[in-house]
Design a protein with these regions (language model features):
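Ubiquitin-like/PB1-type beta-grasp interaction modules and other compact soluble beta-rich domains
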Residues: 1-71
Length: 72
């Protein structure tokens, strides 16, 4: 059986361990994030949602997921 390597990242200010080389898209699926209602920042750069399945998370990355909240 193949061992899954884990890496440490910072997600919304908290350190977590996740599968190495996971894409941002799969990370959002893992945490049930509604990608149409959030902005995702990777190492202080806003990520284009069309790129989520192409960008692989790396060790020590800092990811912020910000939810949009409507108001009036």
């Amino acid at each position: 059986m193949k061992k899954i390597n884990k890496i440490k990242i910072k997600l919304n200010g908290k350190y977590i361990k996740i599968q190495d080389r996971i894409t941002l898209f799969n990370l959002t699926k893992k945490f049930k994030v509604p990608i149409n209602k959030v902005a995702i920042e990777l190492n202080q750069v806003i990520v284009n949602k069309k790129s989520l399945d192409k960008i692989k998370v790396k060790k020590n990355d800092k990811i912020e997921i910000v939810h949009f909240i409507g108001g009036g």
